[in-house]
């Protein structure tokens, strides 16, 4: 992964791993098929931290790329949020994410997404509210450095008839679901208040979206309320490193962003937020690899 990041001319790269879950009931179907238990997840995470710190020491000394070591929060419930606060002390940064609602994965497949919606009362609107309320608890308790895939709840949403009588694709969340929009704005304002960043996460494109997370309505809301963006590939394999960043950059320009932000370590080893001009970044030879 790091070798690919260097080959692709990245100057800063954050290694992350999902924090372990507390009980076997939260294992994904693919993990169950492999015979995993939470003990495996805990051991894997501990091994990750050791290995990542070793890579970080080597690469940061060499100076070609700066590596940060972080983790991704599993904002399943308050117990997992409390566990995440412990891991936060051991890492350079954390990504605040929600992958479960009512203990059910919302990013694995449509069937489980439907189960989560049923648990929320059977409507997509109610599921959105539960998702953004849980996300708020993650943000409030942990103040994550980066908010992960802000609107992940949309990944498996199909274009169905809403209670308003319109297709979901025709729903303007701000106008038609003001109760949901209020929660979204609340979450954005909280992140802005402590200086957190929002991902422009390119993994949505490889999963079939036309844009990164978040989609344009929420991205514009983040801009409106003073939020800042960083780039993320959410890579789970070396072939996904910086994948579709050229399309993310088109999105950056569509949004009219003037600056993009990233995390880095200062001379004291403290994680800080750094700012780069979109105009200057656009001139880098980095983009030649996408032509």
Regions found by a protein language model. Give the residues of each.
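An N-terminally biased module of ancient metal coordination in phosphate/nucleic-acid-related enzymes
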Residues: 1-77, 86, 161-178, 202, ...
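Short, well-ordered alpha-helical microsegments
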Residues: 76-79, 215
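Hydrophobic faces of well-ordered beta-strands that scaffold small-molecule active sites
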Residues: 13-15, 67-71, 94-96, 146-148, ...
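Short, conserved acidic/polar surface loops in the N-terminal third of protein domains
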Residues: 26, 78-83, 105-109
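Charged catalytic cores and adjacent phosphate/nucleic-acid-binding surfaces used
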Residues: 1, 154-156, 160-291
């Amino acid at each position: 992964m790091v070798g690919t990041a260097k080959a692709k001319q990245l100057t800063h790269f954050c290694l992350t791993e999902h924090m372990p879950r507390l009980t076997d009931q939260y294992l994904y179907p693919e993990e169950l098929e492999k015979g995993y238990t939470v003990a495996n997840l805990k051991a894997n995470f501990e091994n990750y931290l050791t290995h990542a710190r070793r890579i970080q020491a080597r690469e940061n000394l060499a100076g070609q790329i700066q590596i940060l070591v972080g983790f991704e929060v599993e904002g399943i419930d308050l117990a997992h949020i409390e566990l995440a606060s412990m891991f936060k002390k051991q890492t350079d940064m954390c990504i605040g994410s929600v992958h479960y609602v009512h203990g059910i994965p919302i990013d694995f497949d449509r069937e489980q997404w439907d189960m989560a919606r049923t648990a929320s009362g059977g409507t997509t609107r109610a599921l959105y509210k539960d998702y953004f309320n849980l996300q708020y608890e993650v943000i409030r308790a942990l103040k994550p450095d980066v908010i992960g895939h802000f609107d992940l709840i949309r990944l498996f949403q199909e274009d169905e008839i809403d209670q308003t009588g319109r297709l979901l694709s025709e729903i303007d969340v701000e106008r038609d679901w003001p109760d949901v929009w209020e929660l979204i704005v609340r979450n954005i304002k909280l992140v802005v208040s402590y200086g957190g960043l929002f991902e422009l996460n390119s993994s949505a494109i490889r999963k079939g979206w036309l844009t990164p997370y978040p989609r344009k309505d929420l991205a514009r809301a983040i801009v409106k309320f003073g939020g800042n963006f960083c780039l993320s590939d959410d890579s789970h394999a070396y072939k996904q490193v910086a994948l579709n960043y050229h399309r993310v950059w088109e999105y950056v320009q569509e949004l009219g962003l003037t600056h993009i932000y990233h995390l880095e370590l200062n001379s004291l080893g403290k994680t800080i937020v750094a700012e780069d001009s979109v105009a200057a970044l656009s001139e880098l030879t980095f983009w030649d690899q996408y032509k």
